[in-house]
Design a protein with these regions (language model features):
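Flavin (primarily FAD) cofactor-binding/catalytic cores of flavoenzymes
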Residues: 2-56, 61, 99-266, 272-468, ...
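Redox-cofactor-proximal catalytic regions of oxidoreductases
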Residues: 53-98
Length: 480
């Protein structure tokens, strides 16, 4: 149920149940909220949860897109919301469609967003009335953790007090890439294509050439949308590497364990190099090896020293990413069509953009040609380093010292279990997170298969903690 901030504050004033505030209603926030309700029911715990997001639509950026060409890059068989029910998404699709669902299908992200909404709604029905989850459409301007509570101050005024706050921030919104900051206000430059209204702005642009800065999955999404909006428009993608994400093969292919995965004497970097060598040599099994390495990536990453992680990010991260985060087969086929027809061009290098009189924006291609652009779109993807984020809440948290960036600029500095570390290095007991903010700690943490595991673990820990505090207070009252 959607409620106003005033209604929630009034309810909170009279509520005796512990309160958990979840900031962010994307996949991370929705998965955690559902698991929190399930864990509360199982433990017989009464609690109140408040799910806050400035968007009225659930699903966050990834799963609120309405473009049917935006697909999951994992098969339906791998996208269950529940670690202990791997076929849950497949069965949901069957019930929805009334026919057998294909486990190896790559569903649209919009459909997956509807699934997450259904999962959360079912959890709410099961938990009521002992546990409640209330949704609030509001921007959280500041989070202020204290010894025994957390205060969330809302941009529109007012505040909510919680016993624990889970910041399900997801991927941080895109910011202007280094060197392009002065173009952020240019009418033909789109800094973050996922902001509300920007897709419509892209669709309404003229038929002139469009520059896509980047060549990863965000570029792919934009290219597919632009190809629908502008059937004859020229698309130019440029990135430093010029590397496109690789493609999944059709069908469900079982992961192939790399023989040395369990050998602690073989480093993560050596494993990555072996897999990339297989890919360069044209081996048919490299995809299975990538997927076989995924379940143990976090353990290997944790064993790397700071220096080894820094070298990996500089020397191997991009190459590994294009093999690890692959395109759905039908998406890859469409991108290949666009490239073959010449409608999409792919270049390596750094785009040179020049402001020209009359509000024009001109691109100088590596070969020397100048192109008068209709639009230039930042498609480099989400910001990794929170210090580069323009999000007001992130900036407030950093400035106040309640959180700190990971030393390598990989998300936030977090402790095992998802607690944020403060500026002084101590971890918060009441300010927690999951998913992409933990990339520096875990590396493999941005996709649903990992986030659902974290959501379950975090929910169990939160319920256990709040139940323990409630019992301690009851004991204190009875003996006082």
């Amino acid at each position: 149920m959607l409620r106003s901030a005033a209604e929630l504050q009034l309810a909170g004033d009279s509520a005796s149940r512990p309160t958990v505030a979840i900031v962010g209603a994307g996949a991370s926030g929705m998965l955690f909220s559902a698991q929190l309700l399930h864990a509360g029911v199982a433990a017989g715990a009464g609690l109140r949860a408040v799910l806050l997001d400035r968007r009225e639509t659930l699903g966050g950026v990834a799963y609120s897109t309405l473009d049917p060409s935006h697909r999951l890059n994992v098969t339906a068989a791998g996208m269950s919301a529940f670690p202990d029910a791997p076929d849950h998404f497949v069965h949901w699709r069957e019930q929805l469609g009334g026919t057998a669902s294909e486990p190896d299908a790559y569903a649209s992200r919009a459909e997956y967003g509807r699934y997450l909404s259904a999962v959360l709604a079912a959890a709410q029905r099961r938990a009521a009335p002992a546990l409640s989850l209330e949704r609030l459409v509001a921007e959280v301007a500041a989070v202020e953790p204290a010894h025994d509570h957390v205060t969330l101050r809302l941009a529109g005024g007012g505040a909510i007090e919680a016993d624990i706050a889970v910041l399900a921030l997801g991927n941080l919104p895109a910011a202007a890439p280094p060197g392009y900051e002065e173009l952020a206000d240019h009418p033909r430059f789109i800094c973050d294509p996922w902001l509300p209204g920007e897709i419509e702005r892209i669709a309404a642009a003229g038929e002139g050439p469009v520059l896509l800065i980047g060549s990863g999955l965000t570029m792919v999404d934009m290219a597919l949308s632009l190809a629908r909006f502008r059937p004859d428009g020229r698309l130019i993608a440029i990135s430093r590497s010029g590397l496109l994400p690789r493609a999944h093969l059709p069908g469900c292919v079982a992961p192939r364990p790399v023989p040395t995965l369990v050998d602690p004497n073989v480093s993560f970097v050596e494993l990555i190099d072996r897999v990339l060598l297989e890919a360069r040599n044209g081996s048919a099994r490299w995809r299975q090896m990538v997927d076989g390495l995924r379940p143990v990536t976090q353990a290997h990453w944790r064993r790397l020293s700071f220096e080894q992680r820094a070298v990996f990010m500089t020397m191997r991260h991009r190459a590994w990413s294009v093999h690890r985060h692959r395109m759905a087969p039908e998406v890859a086929a469409r991108v290949s069509e666009l490239l073959a027809s010449g409608r999409l061009e792919l270049h390596s290098g750094v785009p040179e953009l020049t402001r020209v009189a009359g509000g024009r924006l001109v691109l100088s291609l590596p070969g020397g040609d100048d192109v008068d652009l209709s639009l230039a779109i930042n498609a480099t993807g989400p910001v990794l380093d929170p210090r580069a984020s323009t999000q007001s809440l992130v900036r407030q948290l950093l400035a106040a010292g309640h959180v700190r960036a990971h030393p390598l600029g990989l998300g936030f500095d977090t402790a095992p279990g998802g607690a944020f570390r403060r500026r002084d290095g101590a971890s918060h007991s009441r300010l927690l997170t999951l998913g992409p903010p933990r990339i520096g700690e875990l590396y493999e943490t941005t996709a649903v298969p990992e986030i659902r595991e974290q959501a379950l673990e975090l929910a169990l820990n939160v319920v256990a903690r709040l139940s323990g505090e409630r019992d301690a207070l009851a004991l204190s009252a009875s003996t006082g």
